Amino acid sequence: MGFLKKLILFSLFLFFIACNKGINNEFEYIEISRENYTNKLHGFWLGQSIANWTSLITEMDKIGNIGEIKTGNFYTRDDWGGIDQRSIWEDSLVNKSRVKIDFVLKDESDIWGSDDDTDIEYMYQYLLNFNDTSILSPNQIRDGWLKHIKSNEENYLWESNQVAFDLMKSGMKPPETGDPINNNSYMMIDAQLTTEIFGLLSPSRPDIGLKMAELPIKTTARYEAQEIAEFYVIMHSLASNSKEFNSTKENIFWIAKESREHLNDNNYPAKMYDFTEKLYKSGINWENARDSIYQRYQVDQKDGYNITSKNLYCNGCFAAGIN
């Protein structure tokens, strides 16, 4: 049975089980249109691909002014459409005169390239179908990684993903591959980029999404990085909620608020969320909000976010929190 058919059946299954007893002991059912949800899944992959390739233009251009690598002021809206500046990885001989900061789009007949975030999500989608399961086992994850990820060639894995992959090659299985004892990159961004899809595979049931995503998240993350990844699984699950909203903005804010409830108030993800929300409500523009976040967390290291003190390459620019 094809994956899409299974997903449709799963959505129908949720129609019967995703319910709560109301005041009168009556069940409230969640009904999801198969056609509409298929279109939304298409939008997920398309939007993610456009965002990936558009952001790659400016990736690593601006990482702040702390440590050995300093890149000057951050970009602003005035830079959109202008010439892309050199990243910290690019040789000075690279000609940037024709590289503009703009959307990257492709024709419907083209094939999108990718890196580890979308690749691994696509792999997890495949492994669920291949193994005919909704909960992947440690062996299934390890075998899938070793089969589908290049070992000796460039595989475009970064940070915790690469460490976990190396550990798998040595015989280790998840969740040990994400344990801080074995993986010193457990606090990086990897898990939140590679497990959002489990929220989409559990529409309007974040509790199911978290169960499906638990081991994949722990494959590369722990503590706050794990919590942030779970936050995004919940958001993606709630994106298919059946509530009525006056606008997309109202819908997104509701999703964010509901997902915020999962965050521990004492940890930096919750404090970062609250600080960013406060900045938004203050009415300042996004450039000033971005600069305020940089100052508070990367310069001043507030709310327990101490990545800068670890003296990591590019000041921990791939860390889960600041991203």
Q: Each predicted region: which residue ranges?
A:
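Accessory "access/gating" subregions that flank catalytic or transport cores
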Residues: I32, F165-Y186, T195-R205, E214-T219, ...
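Mature N-terminal segment immediately following signal peptide/propeptide cleavage
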Residues: N36-N52
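Active-site cavity-forming subdomains of large catalytic enzyme subunits
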Residues: L46, D110-D116, I120, Q125-E230
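N-terminal leader/propeptide and maturation segments of large enzyme subunits in energy/redox metabolism
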Residues: R98, D102-S114, T118, Y124-E153, ...
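Active-site-surrounding "flap" and adjacent substrate/cofactor-binding loops of secreted or lumenal enzymes
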Residues: I57-F103, T118-I120, R142, E153
